[in-house]
């Protein structure tokens, strides 16, 4: 394999029902940083039905080129068909790097493509960089149960591939004046490429604001002791007053106190709210991996030596069952809520 033939950092853009996912923009922002470092260009691959109008949004967020596969057969995600499209693109265009969102779709599509192309894939990256040779991407991710951060490279194969969780990187500001090239491609598909059939989309319900969309998250850990603070008690009350969502550590979810949809951390969701209030969360690497993208972290913990105090913006040493109700009442007073 002549590595010099492979050019371009490409984001596999993800859209749902005609709307681009924010993770696609976040990856484009990071792709531009990497491309500027190694002197390469940024591209995006867009797949679906009636998706061509979305190409300009990708250009506005950093793509120099957008390759569009607009096909009625590709309206709904299909693992084998989408993988065939991406693999065909690789053989035709020879990209250097594929960046994929660590979403439900990305976690399915990325490994399938990597396996087909006989290359490596680093999953759930929290940081991207460039090796000293200015050619090899350095993928950083938690390892050994989240106790260390591993740096992984793929020096001898192409494409270099990795998945990145939503909200790990900031979404860049759109530049409406940006220009780029939109290239329409034809998907070369047969019935054999569709090993599954889309039957029905069932959207999961859920009360309140989703944690991945929330501007404020009030999260609890093992120290909450029961489900009551999450469902009706102090965490829920504070989140409701702030118009936010309730989050939880893995320990709280494993204890059965709250649904896994609320889990923040290495094995849960990665979030990037304006305010993250961590209640009785010690600050081990696992939950920190999901919250460090927050603009402001406020920690409440009775253990003054808890690791969370090393990463938070504001720390309160005290009993969360005493401190948080006082904080909630102060917010109510400030807002004029009875």
From Swiss-Prot:
Q: Which UniProt keywords apply?
A: Electron transport, FAD, Flavoprotein, Transport
Task: Report the CDD domains cross-referenced here.
Answer: ETF_alpha
Q: Which cofactor does it need?
A: FAD
Which InterPro entries does the UniProt record give?
DHS-like_NAD/FAD-binding_dom, ETF_a/b_N, ETF_a/FixB, ETF_alpha_N, ETF_asu_C, ETF_asu_C_CS, Rossmann-like_a/b/a_fold
Superkingdom of origin organism:
Bacteria
Q: Which is a GO BP term held by this UniProt record?
A: fatty acid beta-oxidation using acyl-CoA dehydrogenase
Q: Which GO terms describe its molecular function?
A: electron transfer activity; flavin adenine dinucleotide binding
Record text on subunit structure and interactions: Heterodimer of an alpha and a beta subunit.
Q: Which family does it belong to?
A: Belongs to the ETF alpha-subunit/FixB family.
What protein is this chain from?
A: Electron transfer flavoprotein subunit alpha
Q: What is the lineage of its organism?
A: Bacteria, Bacillati, Bacillota, Negativicutes, Veillonellales
């Amino acid at each position: 394999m002549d590595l010099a033939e492979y050019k371009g950092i490409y984001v596999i853009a993800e859209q749902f029902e005609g709307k681009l996912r924010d993770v696609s923009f976040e990856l484009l922002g990071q792709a531009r940083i990497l491309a500027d470092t190694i002197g390469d260009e940024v591209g995006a691959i867009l797949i679906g039905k009636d998706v061509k109008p979305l190409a300009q949004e990708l250009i506005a967020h950093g793509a120099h080129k957008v390759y569009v596969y607009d096909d009625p057969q590709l309206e709904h995600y299909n693992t084998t068909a989408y993988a065939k499209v991406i693999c065909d693109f690789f053989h035709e265009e020879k990209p250097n790097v594929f960046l994929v969102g660590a979403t439900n779709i990305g976690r399915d599509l990325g490994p399938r493509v990597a396996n087909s192309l006989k290359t490596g894939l680093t999953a759930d990256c929290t940081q991207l960089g460039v090796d000293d040779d200015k050619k090899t991407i350095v993928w950083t991710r938690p390892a050994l149960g989240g106790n260390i951060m591993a740096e992984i490279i793929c020096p001898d194969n192409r494409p270099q591939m990795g998945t990145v969780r939503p909200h790990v990187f900031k979404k860049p500001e759109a530049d409406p004046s940006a220009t780029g090239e939109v290239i329409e491609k034809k998907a070369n598909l047969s019935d054999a490429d569709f090993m599954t059939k889309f039957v029905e989309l069932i959207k999961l319900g859920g009360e309140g604001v989703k944690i991945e969309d929330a501007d404020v998250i009030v999260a609890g850990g093992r120290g909450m002791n029961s489900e009551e603070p999450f469902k009706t008690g102090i965490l829920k009350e504070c989140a409701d007053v702030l118009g936010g969502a309730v989050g939880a550590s893995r320990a709280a979810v494993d204890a059965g106190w709250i649904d896994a949809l609320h889990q923040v951390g290495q094995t849960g969701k990665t979030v990037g709210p304006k305010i993250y209030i961590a209640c009785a969360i010690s600050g081990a690497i696992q939950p920190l991996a999901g919250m460090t993208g927050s603009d402001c972290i406020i920690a409440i913990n009775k253990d003054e030596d808890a690791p969370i105090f090393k990463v938070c913006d504001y720390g309160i040493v005290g009993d969360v069952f005493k401190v948080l109700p006082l904080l909630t009442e102060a917010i109510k007073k400030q807002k004029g809520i009875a």
